[in-house]
Amino acid sequence: MLMINSFDNPRLAQAFVDYMATQGVILEIQRHDTWDIWLADEAQAERVKAELSYFLAHPGDPRYLSASWQTGQLNAGLRYRSYPFMASVRAHAGPLTLGMMALCVVAYLAMSIIGSPQVAVWLAWPFDPSLKFQLWRYVSPLLLHFSLLSLIFNLLWWWYLAGPLERSVGSGKLLTLTLVTALVGGVIQYQIAGPWFGGLGGVVYALVGYVWLRGEREPESGLYLPRGILVFMLLWLAIGGLGLFGNKTANADLVAGMLIGLAMAMTDTLHARKRK
């Protein structure tokens, strides 16, 4: 086998592999510290390298964006080596993504052992004027999850969305998006329902908005959200707004998060186009 190229961005690697599959060339991705592209049929090496040169110069070309659909399957020509579960989790995420997951788990365990009321008193939004200078309280409600289902749901989506964003755009952008959403969403929740709220839901929806819109407007960023997932998240938001899960007030935080994500993505893509 012949190694063709190594990618830091797995989405770019998959886009190239999917496109070559539509051209009748089967490539294999082997995932280590980078995503390495391997070719079994070395007789096609020159053709693949020529295509690679064009791909690296024009990663946003529509031919690559539609390749997965043309093949009729989402993993056309794509074969991964199996790696331990935790290694796969780490490979998909950066330090901020993993750190937030760890803190949420620790907070949930503390709530289970010490008791939810006590931990909530430590981490809740400032519920008394004397607490307004305890600055961590404007962010720490993100760590509070009041059910195991809520924790699992939010952490899975956080990992799925925040990981690629951090790897593609950087930890700074993820931190900014998280802090802005925590502050704005917290103010909204406090005004509507008081200080006793928590969870990553608002940030998850900010990530949905950001990843989707930036991926649509700037494909070369390496960000991409399948439209099926976008539709699912919007339906979930609508169902929550009807109060079918018993907490309509939390929906304001989710809507605010989505709008923040969309606004930040629009701002970033406009700035990127001006620089060009």
Curated annotation (Swiss-Prot):
The chain crosses the membrane at residues 94-114, 142-162, 168-188, 192-212, 225-245, 252-272. InterPro entries: GlpG_N_sf, Peptidase_S54_GlpG_N, Peptidase_S54_rhomboid_dom, Rhomboid-like_sf, Rhomboid_protease_GlpG. It comes from the Bacteria. Keywords: Cell inner membrane, Cell membrane, Membrane, Transmembrane, Transmembrane helix. One of its GO terms (biological process) is proteolysis. The keyword Disulfide bond does not apply. Pfam families: Rhomboid, Rhomboid_N. GO terms for molecular function: serine-type endopeptidase activity. It is found in: Cell inner membrane. SUPFAM superfamilies: Rhomboid-like. Its main location: membrane. One of its GO terms (cellular component) is plasma membrane. It is a multi-pass membrane protein. Belongs to the peptidase S54 family. PANTHER family: RHOMBOID PROTEASE GLPG, RHOMBOID-RELATED PROTEIN. This is Rhomboid protease GlpG homolog. It comes from Cronobacter sakazakii (strain ATCC BAA-894). The lineage of its organism: Bacteria, Pseudomonadati, Pseudomonadota, Gammaproteobacteria, Enterobacterales. The gene is glpG.
